[in-house]
């Protein structure tokens, strides 16, 4: 089979790894190679970072007004809209996500660039009302310099966009390192950035493996900020690497999000919300609602109706319009899911649905929608992120118990609440220790809405105005208005 060949984007040029080494990317639906990419090493990282630093210092980028940067971002958003079908098809092939879902994600990506473009010239400083009549002071937001974006395999386009747009709006340059399992659409985004008129070297993309390429990037002394999305184990390596140079960090990590269904909820909507929360994207989402908390009055009915609905999910080729659940993105992740399912069975969780690979003609990495009933929240399947189509359901008696179970987790990324009681919704939204709360909906996103978690789900926020400010340094400037000589040098003014 002929493989599609990709090159890296460094300084506006399409290049191979200096070593000439490559690696294959596998199609998850077929478990077969479909693309060949450069296997970058430390030397390639060095030239990418140096390219970004040179571009940051160049008048072609540094000399642009904020309004001009915003216009470039808006043009990039327009190009994404013009190329949406190509991008959707490419991502579906590369990481196994449903074509229905990739089309949906690509359709709202332009909004992220358009919204952020409008913020580029809104990064206002301020004057300080000093009580010192001979001094004047003001603040200004300035770009940081070279920043790095580490992108996972589950939603590379979306998770690149929410790093790239604010970084450029603030005036930085960037080196992107996508997952070796899903690099194609990030490279395509770099091509569109060049087409939009963004100067060479402002957006660079290097491909390779985390322990080599990623590690070299995160410890590079010229990288002033790292935006990372991924698992906690890798994040710990990133934190240690970045500490060498005190680079700032934004970490969007895992979750074990509670999806709480009260007896007064609209059950039809709640069941669809549960399916969306855990079986969409084959459960490969940081915000997956993998812990289902159901009030005891409706517990049995809800579980039976959820089983009936989930058992009808159509598994198959992600590029088929009728498919509702595609494969896992990697063989390694499929093995992780199978291991956690085995642990759940050994611990006494009751398997109600799935728990195995489906019988399909394809050799891809598919897994059935799976549901466990659990009698305690301390079970491993209730505490560890699966990152697959595996939900665990537990009953609760009242609001207080639901809150206790919801907060009994090392994670705090997202939560869902299904109820008609407005007061209850507000109380739980206030008291649940999670960065995102959805009430009577799930997986809603907007360019205006910050994304990020509490506890072991990371820190920092992406999307919204705060995400752009997070890519700036705040400078304070003092001006002496007096014509008088400097007073006593040993007394602080």
Model-inferred region functions:
Residues 125-269, 396:
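Rossmann-like NAD(P) dinucleotide-binding subdomain of oxidoreductase/dehydrogenase enzymes
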Residues 225, 233-376, 439, 486-493:
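ALDH superfamily catalytic-core signature
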Residues 34-123:
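Glycine-rich loop-to-alpha-helix module at the N-terminal edge of alpha/beta enzyme cores
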Residues 114-129, 311-315, 346-353, 359, ...:
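Proline-centered turn/helix-capping motifs that create local helix->coil transitions or kinks
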Residues 30-36, 223, 260, 314, ...:
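Conserved C-terminal structural/oligomerization subdomain of aldehyde/semialdehyde dehydrogenase
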């Amino acid at each position: 089979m002929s493989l599609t060949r990709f090159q890296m984007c460094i300084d506006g040029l399409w290049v191979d790894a200096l070593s000439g080494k490559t690696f294959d990317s596998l199609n998850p639906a077929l478990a077969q190679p479909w693309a060949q990419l450069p296997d970058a090493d430390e030397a390639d990282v060095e030239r990418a970072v140096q390219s970004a630093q040179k571009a940051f210092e160049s008048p072609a980028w540094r000399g642009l007004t904020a309004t001009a940067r915003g216009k470039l971002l808006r043009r990039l958003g327009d190009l994404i809209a013009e190329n949406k079908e190509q991008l959707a098809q490419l991502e579906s092939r590369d990481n196994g996500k449903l074509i229905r879902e990739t089309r949906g994600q690509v359709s709202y990506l332009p909004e992220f660039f358009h919204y952020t473009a409008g913020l580029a010239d809104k990064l206002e400083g301020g004057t300080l009302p000093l009580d010192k009549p001979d001094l004047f002071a003001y603040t200004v937001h300035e770009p940081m310099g070279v920043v790095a974006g580490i992108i996972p395999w589950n939603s590379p386009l979306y998770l690149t966009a929410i790093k790239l747009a604010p970084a450029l709006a603030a005036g930085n340059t960037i080196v992107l390192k996508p997952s070796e399992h899903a690099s194609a659409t990030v490279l395509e985004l770099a091509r569109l950035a060049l087409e939009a008129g963004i100067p060479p070297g402002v957006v660079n993309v290097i491909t390779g493996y985390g322990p080599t390429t990623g590690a070299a990037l995160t410890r590079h002394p010229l990288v002033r900020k790292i935006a990372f999305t991924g698992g906690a184990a890798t994040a710990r390596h990133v934190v240690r690497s970045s500490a060498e140079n005190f680079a700032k960090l934004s970490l969007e990590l895992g979750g074990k999000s509670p999806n709480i269904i009260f007896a007064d909820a609209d059950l039809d909507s709640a069941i669809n919300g549960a399916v969306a929360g855990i079986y969409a994207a084959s459960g490969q989402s940081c915000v997956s609602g993998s812990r289902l908390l159901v009030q005891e009055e409706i517990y049995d009915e809800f579980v039976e109706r959820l089983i009936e609905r989930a058992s009808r999910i159509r598994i198959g080729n992600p590029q088929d319009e009728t498919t509702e659940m595609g494969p896992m993105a990697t063989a390694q992740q499929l093995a992780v899911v199978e291991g956690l399912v085995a642990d759940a069975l050994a611990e006494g969780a009751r398997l109600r649905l799935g728990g195995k690979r489906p019988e399909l003609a394809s050799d891809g990495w598919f897994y059935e929608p799976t549901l466990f009933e659990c009698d305690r929240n301390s079970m491993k399947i209730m505490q560890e992120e699966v990152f697959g189509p595996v939900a665990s359901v537990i009953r609760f008696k009242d609001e207080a118990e639901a809150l206790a179970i919801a907060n009994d987790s090392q994670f705090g990324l997202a939560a869902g609440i299904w109820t008609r009681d407005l007061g209850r919704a507000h109380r739980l939204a206030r008291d649940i220790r999670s960065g995102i709360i959805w009430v009577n909906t799930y997986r809603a996103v907007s360019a205006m809405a910050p994304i990020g978690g509490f506890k072991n789900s990371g820190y920092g926020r992406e999307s919204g105005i705060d995400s752009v400010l997070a890519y700036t340094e705040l400078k304070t400037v003092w001006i002496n208005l007096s014509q008088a000589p400097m007073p006593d040098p040993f007394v602080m003014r």
